[in-house]
Structures are given as C-alpha cells and as structure tokens.
C-alpha cells in the first residue's frame, strides 16, 4: 500500500482524528519484524481550550513534541504501566495531537499475542495502552517522524461516513463534554466503552473550540 506523505498530517486536529480511521499503522523493528494494524478509534486533543490536553498550560519538557511538526509521535507514560501513542497535528508551534485509541491487528499477530500475553485478537489492541504494547512502542520513539523507517501509515479506503461514531472522550476528568472521540461503529476492536452513535451528516467544518 502507498505510504501517507507529510500533507496527510497537515490538517486540523479534529479533522485528522476522523481521517485516521481505517488507515494502516506499520511498525518496523530494527530486526526487520513488521507489525501492522488498522486504526479504528481515535481521540482529538487541542492545546487551546481543552483542559484535558497535556499542553493546555503550555509547553513542558514532557509535552514538547505536541508543539512540533505534524506527523510526528507524541508518546507518554500513564497509570504507572502504559504508554500512549499520539500523532502530532496542527502547525508547528501550535499544540495538538490525536490519540490512537484502538486498532485492528492485521500482520505480525503472533508477535502481538506474545507481547500482550493473550491469544484473543479482539483484546490485543482494544485500548491505547494495549495497542502500544502490541506494537512494541515505547519512549524510544518519542518525537519520531511517521515519514521514517520505524513507523509509518499506509493509505486505505476511507471509512464511510455512516459508519463513523462520535462521542465524548474516555477516561478524562476535564473538558468531558467535548465530543472528540471518533470510532468505527462496525469494528469489534474498538475499546469496550461504546458511547455515541453514528453521525448522520457531516458538519460544515470541523473547527477548534
């Protein structure tokens, strides 16, 4: 499949969160081992007007990648045991990122099962911490480009509008009202909390709040 170029990531965060659905995330390790998965759930985070965003209070050493060029990875550690993978969005200097919340495993499944300690394919990547573990991604890829050779996205058919669900984001305590979670309603691989329903019509424009 064709790799997605830099122009794909040069989109407003809310738009990118939806455009990422259905795309193929590829992880290539130094050993040559390749794992692939289809993105089926995302969440958008904006540095401006979004108190749930790590960059809401400005740049720190931890969140500096969010202010960098789009199409790079912002990876952070949470709950004392999980890494979370985000794709940086917005123009350089403006904080924004899309959390990869769930994926459908496609290739290298045996390796994913070994890492996760489960044979259940539905449970392999049905959460942000799970998918990072399945792909073998940690802090060593913080700030890395999706135009490189360690990770990249491949193009795939766009998900039909009627199969895209929208809901508030999960597991946050601030800005909980913002409907910035996107997911493929027909996928059995989304996280266990299925909120919201398929959207019936496209908004005129996806804008920041």
Swiss-Prot record:
Molecular function, one GO term: alkylbase DNA N-glycosylase activity
Enzyme class, broadest EC rank: hydrolase
EC number: 3.2.2.-
Keyword DNA repair part of the UniProt annotation: yes
Protein name as catalogued: Putative 3-methyladenine DNA glycosylase
Similarity comment: family membership: Belongs to the DNA glycosylase MPG family.
NCBIfam families: 3mg, PRK00802.1-3
Lineage summary: Bacteria, Pseudomonadati, Chlorobiota, Chlorobiia, Chlorobiales
Organism: Chlorobaculum parvum (strain DSM 263 / NCIMB 8327) (Chlorobium vibrioforme subsp. thiosulfatophilum)
């Amino acid at each position: 499949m064709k790799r997605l170029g830099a122009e794909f990531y040069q989109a407003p965060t809310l738009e990118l969160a939806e455009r990422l659905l259905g795309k193929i995330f590829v992880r290539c390790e130094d050993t040559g081992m390749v794992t692939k998965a289809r993105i089926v759930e995302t969440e958008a985070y904006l540095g401006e007007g979004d108190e749930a965003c790590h960059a809401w209070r400005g740049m720190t050493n931890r969140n500096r990648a969010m202010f960098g060029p789009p199409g790079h990875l912002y990876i952070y550690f949470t709950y004392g045991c999980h890494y979370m993978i985000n794709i940086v969005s917005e123009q350089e200097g403006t904080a924004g990122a899309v959390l990869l919340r769930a994926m459908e495993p496609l290739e290298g499944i045996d390796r994913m099962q070994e890492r996760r300690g489960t044979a259940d394919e539905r449970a392999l990547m049905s959460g942000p911490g799970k998918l990072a573990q399945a792909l073998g991604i940690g802090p060593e890829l913080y700030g890395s480009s999706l135009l490189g050779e360690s990770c990249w996205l491949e193009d795939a058919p766009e998900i039909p509008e009627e199969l895209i669900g929208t809901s508030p984001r999960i597991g946050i305590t601030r800005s909980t009202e913002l409907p910035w979670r996107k997911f493929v309603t027909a996928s059995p691989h989304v996280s266990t909390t299925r909120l919201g329903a398929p959207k019936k019509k496209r908004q005129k424009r996806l804008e920041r709040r």
